[in-house]
């Protein structure tokens, strides 16, 4: 029970504001008595007593969860699963929450580890008592697991697998608590997948819906993240100026002291939109004033910065440097096993090769990427590669 409703004077006020009942036959009245202060006290004590065991258990779980998480993460993935399956110590809902956050963070750095951690939570959720925790709450936990599995697969370029995971997440959400924020999180992640599949109008619609829910709930940073996603969808649709406007709107929602990573992500995408809008000199100047963008600690994200530098180099009239940078980007994505992004980098490199008059190299690159893009379901870029091949 919320604290405000545990005070006798508040409960008395609520009851006093109930409609007065008219007499019924025989002169009897419904709710004819006015309880005394001691009656209120006994009622409140009885209600609170029924919550105390659960409250004490939740507090104990929250206190134990960080230590349990640290213990789990010291082990190999195989050993973690054995512990989750067999040790009652780990049957803790607060531990599920911490594991889900660890999965979310790892899903961007190491998609395989992110998916493994979400799988761990799935197994754990099936071992939690639905009578104690609530069936609908556990359905929300399972939904979040499949959201994170889907996102990890998207990051790993398994776009079909991501779709399957998001469908399963929707099934669990329908059986869950009906939390609008959980639904908004799924809308946001599905929008990211649609953007990766180059289904930009659908992505834009989903980002808008997610941002609206987050804003209505006062969740400003998730709302900003959804607006940034919308800005990128607009940029990829050929509307970079609209993307710039949206990014500046998102900037007003982000506190860099609270979430410096989100602020950095926003700055990176503003530079990207400026380059796409043909404002390459502005993009170059903003990148020079943003050393933190080049110093991103995550190796994969540093590849995105190299890719951005290649686009800026092309925009300011240095295609040779753009080609050198794109070769590095392509090769690094190949080394990481990221065929989707390697193919997109190849397509950019083919365009630069045409600019440099290297027609045969451009044709070879286009022929290489077409089957891979089609296999991934990226029809828009596959068509662009086909047109480039025909015009080269």
Model-predicted segments: where are they?
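Short Cys/His-based metal-binding microdomains
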Residues: 1-9
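Amphipathic alpha-helical segments of tetratricopeptide repeats
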Residues: 122-132, 167-178, 208-219, 248-259, ...
């Amino acid at each position: 029970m919320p604290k405000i409703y545990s005070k006798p004077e508040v409960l008395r006020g609520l009851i006093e504001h109930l409609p007065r009942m008219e007499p019924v036959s025989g002169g009897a009245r419904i709710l004819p008595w006015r309880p005394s202060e001691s009656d209120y006290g006994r009622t409140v004590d009885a209600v609170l007593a029924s919550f105390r065991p659960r409250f004490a258990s939740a507090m104990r779980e929250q206190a134990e969860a960080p230590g349990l998480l640290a213990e789990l993460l010291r082990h190999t993935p195989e050993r973690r699963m054995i512990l989750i399956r067999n040790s009652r110590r780990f049957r803790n809902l607060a531990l599920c929450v911490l594991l889900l956050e660890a999965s979310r963070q790892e899903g961007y750095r190491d998609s395989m580890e992110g998916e493994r951690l979400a799988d761990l939570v799935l197994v754990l959720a099936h071992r939690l008592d639905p009578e104690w925790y609530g069936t609908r709450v556990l359905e929300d936990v399972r939904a979040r697991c499949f959201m994170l599995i889907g996102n990890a697969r998207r990051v790993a370029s398994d776009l079909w697998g991501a779709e399957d995971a998001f469908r399963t997440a929707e099934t669990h959400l329908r059986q869950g608590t009906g939390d609008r924020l959980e639904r908004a999180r799924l809308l946001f992640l599905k929008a990211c997948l649609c953007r990766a599949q180059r289904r930009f109008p659908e992505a834009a619609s989903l980002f808008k819906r997610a941002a609206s829910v987050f804003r209505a709930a006062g969740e400003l940073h998730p709302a900003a993240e959804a607006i940034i996603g919308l800005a990128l969808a607009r940029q990829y649709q050929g509307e970079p100026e609209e993307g710039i406007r949206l990014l500046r709107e998102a900037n007003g929602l982000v506190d860099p002291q609270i979430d410096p990573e989100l602020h950095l992500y926003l700055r990176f995408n503003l530079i990207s939109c400026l380059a796409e809008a043909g404002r390459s000199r502005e993009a170059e100047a903003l990148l020079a004033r943003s050393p933190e963008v080049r110093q991103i600690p995550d190796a994969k994200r540093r590849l995105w910065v190299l890719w951005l530098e290649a686009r800026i180099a092309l925009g300011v009239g240095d295609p040779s440097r753009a080609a050198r940078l794109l070769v590095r980007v392509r090769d690094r994505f190949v080394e990481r096993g990221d065929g989707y992004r390697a193919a997109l980098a190849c397509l950019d490199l083919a365009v630069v090769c045409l600019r440099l008059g290297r027609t045969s190299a451009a044709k070879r690159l286009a022929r290489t990427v077409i089957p891979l893009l089609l296999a991934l379901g990226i029809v828009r870029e596959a068509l662009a590669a086909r047109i480039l091949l025909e015009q080269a």
